[in-house]
A protein has these predicted regions:
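Phosphate-binding P-loop
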Residues: 68-74
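Conserved nucleotide-binding/hydrolysis micro-motifs of P-loop NTPases
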Residues: 118-120, 159-161, 175-177, 232-234, ...
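Inter-motif core of Ras-like GTPase G domains
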Residues: 199-205, 221, 225, 237-259
Length: 375
């Protein structure tokens, strides 16, 4: 772990006036972790509390909380699915790269990828950042994203690795090189961790120094788009995001099976309830093309069922992603298909570029909600 982050964590003070819910949930058992374990129900990531802009909380009673923008982020797109195992995280990673590649801005686009899957984070593996080191802290005690393939990323997975003492008291099990340390938390801890990942990350890009009447100042630029990889289902994480953050649009990923489409419909209904606009549906694993007969085979059911579901929901079909080995192989190697050049993945890249262009078009036609900014 970086010396700066460890020192900051070890020297943090939270006062003695917290309620019983804010007491540390566990104590570290070895070495320097004994003094560094400062996590609590109110601060599950253990980030020092000198931030003048605390994350908003969801009130237990009364009116719903006011949605706000994430500081340092212009627009937000969430990638979700009702059913697990449909390739949502892989799509999210490749969508972020597609947005980077298909931008029509006059300068290189600034894209971020946030992993909100607390129990099953995939972004570190997919983006080739498993061994990239620990996130540093900014001067405002915010987590600094790790970057690869031109995309800034943040995930709780960066804080669970063997080398990271940021989670010294996560469980009674010793972390190991297989990176299989579990997050064993109840709902309150999960929701607080989500709030910290949303509002305690510094997404801005430093742009050097500028001279003015007030002297020399350091400049920074916001992300153009933050892609958020959601966990499957319609639970606490989705509800927290929908209540706290002004999201610009959502993409629902599904496969053609009835069981996946049923849950995809539930995901759309949930986003409608929390007033998150729908960009469209994306069909993943739509077909497999045999090398011998060159005929596409719909292994998981007819894509016509997916198209009918989209029609019933009055949503656009953003694309159809085929089942290609290079997608999973690239994800395992930390090289998403969008940064590969293999001929096998060209059909996928073309489909994802089209999706990226559609999302850019959607975002360019939206007016930013008139809400405050937190973080």
């Amino acid at each position: 772990m970086s010396r700066r982050l460890l020192t900051s964590l070890a020297s943090s003070s939270f006062g003695a006036s917290y309620s019983s819910l804010t007491k540390p949930i566990a104590q570290a058992t070895r070495g320097i972790c004994d003094s560094a374990c400062v996590r609590s129900h109110e601060n599950p990531l253990g980030i020092p509390r000198r931030n003048p802009n605390p994350a908003p909380t969801i009130p237990r009673r009364g009116a719903p909380p006011q949605k706000s923008r994430i500081r340092g982020v212009k627009q937000i797109v969430v990638v979700a699915s009702g059913k697990g195992g449909v390739g949502k995280s892989t799509v999210a990673a490749n969508l972020a790269l597609s947005l980077l590649q298909t931008s029509t801005l006059s300068r290189p686009a600034r894209i971020g990828l946030l992993d909100l899957d607390i129990f099953g984070p995939s972004v570190p593996k997919l983006m080739g950042l498993e061994n990239a080191g620990d996130p540093e802290l900014s001067d405002e005690n915010k987590l600094i994203p790790l970057q690869n393939h031109g995309v800034k990323t943040m995930s709780i997975g960066y804080l669970l690795r063997e080398s990271c003492s940021h989670f010294p008291c996560l469980s009674t099990y010793t972390p190991n090189p297989e990176n299989d340390t579990p997050v064993v938390w109840r709902g309150m801890m999960v929701m607080k961790a989500v709030q910290q990942l949303l509002f305690d990350v510094d997404w801005t890009t430093k742009t050097g120094t500028t001279s003015g009447s007030s002297g020399t100042e350091s400049g920074s630029s916001d992300l153009d788009v933050l892609v958020i990889d959601m966990p499957p289902g319609t639970g606490d994480v989705q509800l927290s995001l929908g209540q706290l953050v002004a999201v610009d649009g959502a993409v629902i990923v599904s496969t053609p099976q009835d069981v996946a489409l049923i849950d995809a419909r539930k995901g759309v209904a949930m986003f409608n309830k929390v007033s998150i606009p729908m960009i469209g549906l994306l069909l993943n694993m739509s077909h497999f093309t045999c090398d011998s007969c060159t005929k596409p085979h719909e292994l998981f059911g007819s894509s016509a069922k997916f198209e009918k579901a989209a029609m019933d929901l009055n949503l656009e079909v953003l694309g159809k992603i085929p089942l290609v080995p290079t997608i999973s192989d690239g994800g395992d190697a930390g090289r998403p298909v969008m940064v590969q050049s293999s001929g096998e993945g060209e059909e996928v890249r073309q489909s994802m570029r089209s999706v990226g262009e559609t999302v850019w078009e959607w975002l360019s036609g939206r007016e930013r909600a008139d809400v405050g900014t937190r973080g």
